Amino acid sequence: MYKIVLLRHGESTWNKENRFTGWTDVDLTELGVGEARAAGQLLKREGYSFDLAFTSVLKRANKTLNIVLEELDALWLPVEHSWRLNERHYGALQGLNKAETAAKFGDDQVLVWRRSYDIPPPALEEGDERLNYDDPRYGSLPRARFPRTECLADTVARVVPYWETVIVPQILSGRRILIAAHGNSLRALIKYLDGISDGDIVGLNIPTAQPLVYELDVNLKPVKSYYLADEDTIRAAQAAVAGQGKAKG
């Protein structure tokens, strides 16, 4: 039996402003820092410790992870970073307010862009300043493969191979793993682990900074999964995430 912990980053500045973020490298809010600290304290109270952590190359996930590790007195822990764990790229929606976008295009259309499996938002056009090709953290990513937009299927296509080739061998070696990432990169991984259908994945919402535990059998198939926080806390946090893409009444 193996056990891993998944953790979405704490509230970011654009979460607070209800903006589509994607690959934009925004920081944590004061609340987000507190959420990350609370997550670390919860993991400590529940007796969790880790041998290796994985995260994206975006600061909101990195800072969340560092705060958690500080609470666990484990800042020495080896950490592997990969753009493959980045948030889904939201294309031309990046930076736009979700409620304002819903008011313009309709709640249903924005729900499709946010939560559908295979329909991407409008793509960034060549020359858009949001296409940060020259960012050194993406030095290994060929320009031709740099995303201008992504649907969840595209995110799955980069997350799952990373899981299988990089993370799985570490789990099988007996190392205790923490993955600190993003709402949609975690949705991609959970879809794969739980075998969630393309249609049902629309309803999956990942709350910020709430440790999610997966217990896996010898074949790394989920035996059970659960949040460490109580059900009412998780239900309210998931509802808040679900409501972000709706027009204000």
Swiss-Prot record:
Q: Name one GO biological process term.
A: gluconeogenesis
Q: Which gene encodes it?
A: gpmA
Task: Indicate the annotated site residue(s) for Transition state stabilizer.
Answer: 182
Q: Does the keyword Isomerase apply?
A: yes
- What Gene3D superfamilies has UniProt attached to this entry? Phosphoglycerate mutase-like
- Give one GO molecular function term: phosphoglycerate mutase activity
Q: Does the keyword Isomerase apply?
A: yes
> Could you tell me what this protein is called?
2,3-bisphosphoglycerate-dependent phosphoglycerate mutase
Species per Swiss-Prot/TrEMBL record: Azoarcus sp. (strain BH72)
